[in-house]
Amino acid sequence: MRSGEPACTMDQARGLDDAAARGGQCPGLGPAPTPTPPGRLGAPYSEAWGYFHLAPGRPGHPSGHWATCRLCGEQVGRGPGFHAGTSALWRHLRSAHRRELESSGAGSSPPAAPCPPPPGPAAAPEGDWARLLEQMGALAVRGSRRERELERRELAVEQGERALERRRRALQEEERAAAQARRELQAEREALQARLRDVSRREGALGWAPAAPPPLKDDPEGDRDGCVITKVLL
């Protein structure tokens, strides 16, 4: 192994592989987070990286294009990016460290972790929490009753307003009928007054006319000796 490069035992590599392969999903749980190699946050991690680490840059070769095997210290060209060159890392491991791979079980998926037991039924509240819930329930019931009482009062007020509106309209009709009756009575009174004035004029005209002469009376002694005496009243 070259100097300055960290060494890694098979147990440490196997632990990294187990951590990388652990990601079984359970109902209701999200996927397990995927580990990432040092210095590259968010990049997918392959089990092969448990046996390699990035080699420092060399003259003519940019940093990140070479990976150093933790088992033998050999540098393997992998190309830029963490997705590129993973097959080259696996080829090196299968060709140079097949025995270690078989003994560690790398490349095979470990059994998924058991799912946590489902949550049991919620325990009944006790103490202050129970009293608080009871008070909240009582307040809710009281508020509901208050709302119903207010609704009944509003309905009664609306009914009273409608009754008052009907009464007001009836009074307006009565006032219009009374006004019509007053107009009719006024017309009749004026007609009677006109007739009275006409009768008064007629009576006045009759009072100024000359009196008619009384009728002539027959004198029983007027017919004497065959003479007719005519009495003239002056």
Swiss-Prot record:
PROSITE patterns the UniProt entry points to: ZF_BED
Region entry Disordered, spans: 19-42, 94-126, 202-225
GO biological process assignments: actin filament organization; endoplasmic reticulum localization; establishment of spindle localization; mitochondrion localization; negative regulation of protein phosphorylation; positive regulation of canonical Wnt signaling pathway; positive regulation of embryonic development; positive regulation of transcription by RNA polymerase II
Signal as UniProt keyword: no
GO terms under cellular component: chromatin; cytoplasm; cytosol; extracellular space; membrane
Zinc finger (BED-type): 43-104
Keyword Transcription: no
Superkingdom of the source species: Eukaryota
Tissue expression summary: Secreted in blood plasma, and expressed in skeletal muscle and adipose tissue (at protein level).
Major localization listed first in the record, in broad terms: cytoplasm
Compartments where located: Cytoplasm; Membrane; Secreted
Induction record: Induced in blood plasma by hyperglycemia. Decreased in blood plasma by hyperinsulinemia.
Cystine bridges: none
One GO MF term: zinc ion binding
Basic and acidic residues bias (residue ranges): 216-225
Composition-biased stretches (Pro residues): 111-122
Keywords: Cytoplasm, Membrane, Metal-binding, Secreted, Wnt signaling pathway, Zinc, Zinc-finger
Residues holding Zn(2+): C69, C72, H92, H97
Described purpose of this protein according to its UniProt entry: Acts as a positive regulator in the activation of the canonical Wnt/beta-catenin signaling pathway by stabilizing cytoplasmic beta-catenin. Involved in transcription activation of Wnt target gene expression. Plays a role in symmetric division of blastomeres in the early stages of embryogenesis via regulation of mitotic spindle central positioning and organization of the F-actin filament network. Plays a role in regulating the distribution of cellular organelles, via modulation of cytoskeletal dynamics and cytoplasmic lattice formation.
Subunit-level organization: Associates with the subcortical maternal complex (SCMC) composed of at least NLRP5, KHDC3L, OOEP, and TLE6 via interaction with NLRP5 and TLE6. Interacts with AXIN1; the interaction is direct, enhanced by protein kinase GSK3B and casein kinase CSNK1E activities and decreases GSK3B-induced beta-catenin serine and threonine phosphorylations.
Protein name: Zinc finger BED domain-containing protein 3
